[in-house]
Amino acid sequence: MKQKNQHKKKKKRSCAAKPSGDGTTSDGNKKDVEEERKDGEGKREIENVGKNFIESLMEAFCSVSMEEAMAAYKEAGGDLNKAAEILSDLVESGDDPSTSSVASGSSGQETASTSEYGAGSSSSCSEDLTRDRWFKGSKQSRVIAATGMVSSVIAKDYLKPNPVRKEFPMMERSKELCGNGKKAADREKAEQFLSSMLGDDCELSMAVVRDVLCQCGYDVDMALNVLLDMSSSSTDDSLSGKCFGIGVSDSLAESSFDTDTSDCELFWGGDYSQRDYAKALMSSQDPFATTQGIDELGLPQKVLESLFNIRQNPKHESKTTSWRNVAKKMQSLGIDASSSSGEEPHPNTFVKDDSYHELRKGANDQWNVTKSYYQKAAEAYSKGGRAHAAYLSDKGRVASKQAQRADERASQDIFVARNKGIENVVTIDLHGQHVKPAMKLLKLHLLFGSYVPSIQTLRVITGCGASGFGKSKVKQSVVKLLEREGVRYCEENRGTLLIKLDGGSREFSFLDTESDSDE
């Protein structure tokens, strides 16, 4: 009986220890197993997704390594687009040694790197980046990148700094004209239009026209006013660059053209308002020799230097003189008095008070007419009326030639008024010369005196001859030439002649002969 009772008790205990089908202990174990299974599957799924993302990044960016792709993926917090932006910056800035390094990894890595290198200061910078080169769905986002001593995590540059774009506020129209080929063609047409209005006789080269147009922001009206002031010789300050109104602030000297908007090469200095346009004229590729700005005092020396310019090879030098060519040279270098010799003198030629303004009044009025035509032509050109602009441009060129002639007349009248009462005598000594070279020198000085109105008298020393009785061969030849040409003269003494010059160019008979004798 005892054994049966003990067996029953053991059986009861074992039954009590076994949980029922709906007991709590059995249900808890099942939940734990299920959660562990789900966690394992989730981790494997995350690992597979991350692995796929990393492989996609490596395929898109062939130059990055797996470590770099993983670091960028972790830094982006699992965001594929952000990771792609980081790697794109990494690839673009990889060849630039001046950029910063990528700082990726956890805060523990940053702390370890800081403690390893000492002063590990890091600053954060944000920049809006848009990357659609590899991923079409990427939108504009803000990327936070840390810079500092943690560059050892990924030893490559990551960010290329955007250059500060400073542009001339005055060059907004220049940016529009230089942007593409069509606008560049319009710019060249504007340059050709301005150059055609100035005419072939203008001393301003195409380089100066192009430079002025560029500095005026490709404003045709403004550039035309500047070019007219430069080409007009009636304004004393026309070549100083101070009256043109191209005032540029000092801040422009520190900024530069945007390389995408203008290809103009500026060749003036930092102080743009003080530009010396006279130097630009003289240093251009196709300079013209001016005739109105020649100094009267240095004119004789210039004429003589031009006439007696020795050739490099004397073997082929002609033994005769082309006096017609000599006269042409004097006309090109000196003041051609023939233009006004047949005209009536200006009524105010001998006015002493305020004579300059009185004599310049006609020339200034003519220049104002020229400017009016040119300004109307520029306005018509800007509005697209090319035909009307061409018509007004032709009218302006005609008025410009009239203004130049008025300038020349005014210059001659002023010279006569200022030099009235001044008696200039040029003395030459032909004593000891042979007849032929002596006559050559005399003809040269006769031409010289006829084209230079400031010389009124020519004193010629001929000598009295070997016998001393006034029978010098040189004197006889000189007298014979003067009588044939109809030039007035008188004897100062037996060995000196005073020749009276009329102060105006005249046609000598020896101009068409190549003989240097008295015949």
From Swiss-Prot:
Origin: domain of life: Eukaryota
Boundaries of every Smr domain copy: 428-502
Compositional bias (Basic residues): 1-15
Low complexity compositional bias, start-end: 98-127
Region Disordered: start-end pairs: 1-47, 92-128
Residue stretches of biased makeup (Basic and acidic residues): 28-47
Oligomer status and interactors: Interacts with PRL1.
Protein name per the record: SMR domain-containing protein At5g58720
